[in-house]
Amino acid sequence: MTGHDGRPMVLYDNIFPATPSGKIELKSVALAERWGAAAVLPAWRSRQTPYPLMLVSPASDKRISSTLGDLAGSRQAPPLLMNPADATQRSLTHGDQVRVWNDLGEVLLCLAVTDAIRPGVVASEKGAWLMTSPTGQTISALVSADLKADLAEGACFNDTPVEVGRATP
């Protein structure tokens, strides 16, 4: 696509970050000087945890966080997505009621076994209402309030170690 001057249209081709280098700085001294150490990406750190799976909690296409949770499409708990290799290792099958837990709590969800998720990772949408849960907790209960994702101190919905097993009746 070209503009009125015949040149290719490139979004933001003349806008540059307000950093000393004029480039995106993933580890910025200028941000650290202005906002403190929280502005600098942390160095890699080992995560020693007894929970082998990493829970990611993406946004739902049925809600805006928890807003609109009372609509018909949101009145049930979202499934837990798991890779077939992880399901087989735990003797779990598609449709099983599973328990997802860590030191912060536990949630019961219906398992959806799918190749759409990587081994070692499980996923369930954030924002479900408490009324959808038999334990009175949703996936957000497993997310640490102590870990901060960014300068705005957002929650780490994609950095939550958990384990999954068959729910006992």
Residue locations for each model-derived region?
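Long, low-complexity segments enriched in small/aliphatic residues
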Residues: 1-70
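Long, contiguous, secondary-structure-rich segments that constitute the structural scaffold
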Residues: 65-80, 85-169
